[in-house]
UniProtKB/Swiss-Prot annotation:
Organism: Streptococcus pyogenes serotype M4 (strain MGAS10750)
Subcellular location: Cytoplasm
One of the record's GO cellular component terms: cytosol
Gene: trmFO
Cofactors named for this entry: FAD
Family, per entry: Belongs to the MnmG family. TrmFO subfamily.
Gene Ontology MF terms: flavin adenine dinucleotide binding; tRNA (uracil(54)-C5)-methyltransferase activity, 5,10-methylenetetrahydrofolate-dependent
A GO BP annotation: tRNA wobble uridine modification
Reaction equations catalysed: uridine(54) in tRNA + (6R)-5,10-methylene-5,6,7,8-tetrahydrofolate + NADH + H(+) = 5-methyluridine(54) in tRNA + (6S)-5,6,7,8-tetrahydrofolate + NAD(+); uridine(54) in tRNA + (6R)-5,10-methylene-5,6,7,8-tetrahydrofolate + NADPH + H(+) = 5-methyluridine(54) in tRNA + (6S)-5,6,7,8-tetrahydrofolate + NADP(+)
Protein name (database record): Methylenetetrahydrofolate--tRNA-(uracil-5-)-methyltransferase TrmFO
EC number assigned by the record: 2.1.1.74
Residues noted as binding FAD in the record, renumbered to the chain: G13, A14, G15, L16, A17, G18
Amino acid sequence: MSQSTATYINVIGAGLAGSEAAYQIAKRGIPVKLYEMRGVKATPQHKTTNFAELVCSNSFRGDSLTNAVGLLKEEMRRLDSIIMRNGEANRVPAGGAMAVDREGYAESVTAELENHPLIEVIRDEITEIPDDAITVIATGPLTSDALAEKIHALNGGDGFYFYDAAAPIIDKSTIDMSKVYLKSRYDKGEAAYLNCPMTKEEFMAFHDALTTAEEAPLNAFEKEKYFEGCMPIEVMAKRGIKTMLYGPMKPVGLEYPDDYTGPRDGEFKTPYAVVQLRQDNAAGSLYNIVGFQTHLKWGEQKRVFQMIPGLENAEFVRYGVMHRNSYMDSPNLLTETFQSRSNPNLFFAGQMTGVEGYVESAASGLVAGINAARLFKREEALIFPQTTAIGSLPHYVTHADSKHFQPMNVNFGIIKELEGPRIRDKKERYAAIASRALADLDTCLASL
């Protein structure tokens, strides 16, 4: 198939990946037609018509370079990511993590793209894969049925999917502050989380209520397949009575403050379990329950989650919800630049490619956008080094075993190993990998 001669590039979908792709293309002097159906057709999970809306959590996760997602974010900053730049401008306290005011952040991304002289925003639903120009499809896990059918046809008719869920958000003014305390785990960064401590008795009662609560039904013909990083809390609880204690309710590093006077198990300095609440907006009026993605019926959410100390009278401004995520057989369908193997004028980006997470989705949009622009200019494709996070992630999702392919977060395990003797200390090893990654990225960019 010959290269398109159109004078613009299409980007379909203005989520994190599509917004990033559109910006990267326009930044390189190429006109963009950015299509977004929200505004004329709603999705089950989005609450606004803003671009790059955060549906699940407001966290971009860890910020340290000894954390793989922290490394990926730093690489994206060096590549002038619109998502990272606007995220930084709308940060809220989150200890060692990067969390944002979700409304302020999405509004700022939307304004920047809508006001860009080379970006034409078209509020319309796309039901066919365009063939008029180079196109980046970044319609996300909530792709409309009509377009999803066409994409699945590329997939040989097979639809890969999993379920993920969003956590509830509560009104801070309805939290009983006498029962909670402010602290970040291991006192890392500023004290940014409200912690709801539980005794063993309280935890056992909560676990019992959670595992017997009524869930909203799934379609009968679909299996319950979850992405491990966004698993409903009730599913986690059913795996074992202590599973949550090693996950979102882990008490380690969250010792009681000296002035704590609430119930505790004997003289223990650390609670048996802790539920953490994270600030959700810049004003600090909303908090989400960290790691409590759920598919319980709304009435059950209120009943069970009000058992958490401090939340007895909490008002929920948004209940947790679950949605179906579809993704492609990327190992068979896409190249390392997220370009279609069968149609070189077609790129994909975002969660539909098998990357998982906000940051990873934006990173895939960055890679696809840069390479769509390079194709437009008849330049050689840019494949980032496998020693970098932004190079290793697309390499993984396009080279994985297709038969067992599942969505993947960025992690140090997919980045090329260091040469020489293995560094035993994990933090030192990760720091060395990060240092090499940033040096290699700088070298790569300098050569362009």
